[in-house]
Amino acid sequence: MHGLLLAGLAAALPLGVAGLPARQQSGLSPRGIDINPYRFASMAKYSEHKATSQMVHSFSYSKDDDYVATATKLVKSTFPNMTFRTVKDHYIGTNGIGHVHFKQTAHGIDIDNADFNVNIGRDGKVFTFGNSFYEGEMPKTNPLTKRDFSDPVKALHGAIKTLKLPVKPQSAKAMPMKEAETFKFEGTSGALSDPMAKLVYIQKDGKLHLTWRVETDVGDNWLLSYVDSKETETVHNVVDYVASADYKVFAWGLNDPTEGQPTMIKDPWNTTGTGSPFTWHGDGQMDYTVTRGNNIAAQDNPSGGEQWENNYRPDSPELSFVYEYNEQMEPEQYKDFAITQLFYTTNTFHDVLYSLGFTEEAGNFQMNNNGKGGEGNDFAICNAQDGSGTNNANFATPPDGQNGRMRMYTWTTAQPSRDGDLEAGIVIHEYTHGLSNRLCGGPANSNCLTELEAGGMGEGWGDFYATAIRLKQDDTHDTDYTMGEWAANMQGGIREYPYSTNMQTNPYTYADVQGMDEVHGIGTVWATILYEVLWNLIDEHGMSKNIMPKFVNGAPSDGRNLAMKLVLDGMTLMPCNPNFMQARDAIIDADQALTNGQNKCALMKAFSKRGLGANYKHGKTRVNNFDMPADC
């Protein structure tokens, strides 16, 4: 567990633990179709691993069963009087977990929002499961016998009229497909593909309703409209395959409320890359309307306890996370805003780091690794306004396959109190502990930053990434930055010196580590050195204003992202529990691997300036060396 220690604040702050430092209106959406009145209610139940192991231990499955058979037995045991079918998408993930999905049926007709998913562990036992099966009264008669439902063409007209879809049915004809009671419409215009219809049940308000599921792809909206099978101008529910979300937050690059105002951010996930293929609100199996998804589960935790699953999260069926904040409010009054900000910052950092190389195989934090390696099932649990402390923050990093945990605290250093969730630098610092602990020594070993100097670098990396990300386009080599200044309400921040390339402003060199006996001071020295690295590379390659890096021949084309990439790659190369010299060498090696050593001299200029010169010899006593390599 790591925190962001407030150096020099022992007398000023009541530290209990070691540590750091208008709602959008519903209506016509910008994408054209307002589906909010038609969204399905949430009915899913989920049994996590601990609960599952206690619930299903009495089940006895034959050793001859494959994982699909085992999953099927669980469903039959849970709902012995119900009918269902196995969905043909079962697979075994790279983490060894088998995934099987089932659809409930009635009279051979799908209940479209009644599902059961079973996950089978490597040992052949049920690992977890979830379901939304309908448990009410089933229809007594088979509707296919009487066929007292409307023609599918009428359902298409009903969907178009009720939802005002930009589709012209003209002389639409329903052409039967191979699947029973499934049709494709010919003779329409306005949709990107021929509309479709399928007869299905849905569960709503405790009852089953027979509907035509009308599928229309109109570009900005790809809709499944559930039209009543008899009253075809009644649309019960609508699903949109095109996900959209709005967040009112301090945008990426704004470190805290002193640097700007909250703004509306739309669909920020990096779906054009591969960092968040399920957006931020899905994990490939479940979609959420709260601040939870494949990468992050963000919630409040006022009690400070270990439980998080059922803690409060903002919930928006329309994915409009728009809440108010002003500096006169107490943290409790803006907890929705704070949780949303934490969710936004951590997800954005996840996507940035993914582009730089912190992927599934490298041990990143994701529930579903989507077949790309690594252990999975280990998204980051991020607690906002955690009640277990104040004036601090921390992050716990177990090995790959187990959840990381971030605890963000309120700060009693100002009136009203301030929320660390609103200072991006603190959030980024903490998440970087997860990065460095997963990369140094490999994702299966979280014990490679335990020695004093190595642990100090763990703190320094956090400050480095926090500072690199907050740089502004008009900053120069002479720009200085502090850490934790807003949250701590402390001019000059919580470190001994601000981060600066000016030796008078920040005189730290490697030799200063000699007299230090705690990780945060050592970390400030390491981050000071990396700040020199950062600006030398920006001076060489410029600084992009884009959130995501642009790559040329595999390397970021701008200096800021190149620095973040080389530092990250260096973590993967260095030994378990490295010292400064080994970390320096690993960064140089990372540049050799990435750019064939094009930046060696710019890097060594930074290291030698702060005492880690070419002729430095590591020993019990740290003595500065300011020499440059002969070939520079």
From Swiss-Prot:
EC assignment: 3.4.24.-
InterPro entries recorded: FTP_domain (IPR011096), Fungal_virulence_M36 (IPR050371), Peptidase_M36 (IPR001842), Peptidase_M4/M1_CTD_sf (IPR027268)
Lineage: Eukaryota, Fungi, Dikarya, Ascomycota, Pezizomycotina
Subcellular location: Secreted
Main location: secreted
UniProt organism field: Arthroderma benhamiae (strain ATCC MYA-4681 / CBS 112371)
Function: Secreted metalloproteinase probably acting as a virulence factor.
Pfam families: FTP, Peptidase_M36
PANTHER family listed in its UniProt record: EXTRACELLULAR METALLOPROTEINASE MEP
Annotated gene: MEP2
PROSITE patterns, per database record: ZINC_PROTEASE
Co-factor requirement: Zn(2+)
Gene Ontology biological process: proteolysis
Protein keywords: Glycoprotein, Hydrolase, Metal-binding, Metalloprotease, Protease, Secreted, Signal, Virulence, Zinc, Zymogen
UniProt-recorded name of the protein: Probable extracellular metalloproteinase 2
Gene3D superfamilies: 3.10.170.10, Neutral Protease Domain 2
UniProt-annotated glycosylation sites, renumbered to this chain: N81, N270
Protein family (similarity comment): Belongs to the peptidase M36 family.
Signal peptide start and end residues: 1-19
Residues holding Zn(2+): H429, H433
Key word Metal-binding present: yes
One Gene Ontology CC term in the entry: extracellular region
Keyword presence, Secreted: yes
CDD domains: M36
Domain of life, source organism: Eukaryota
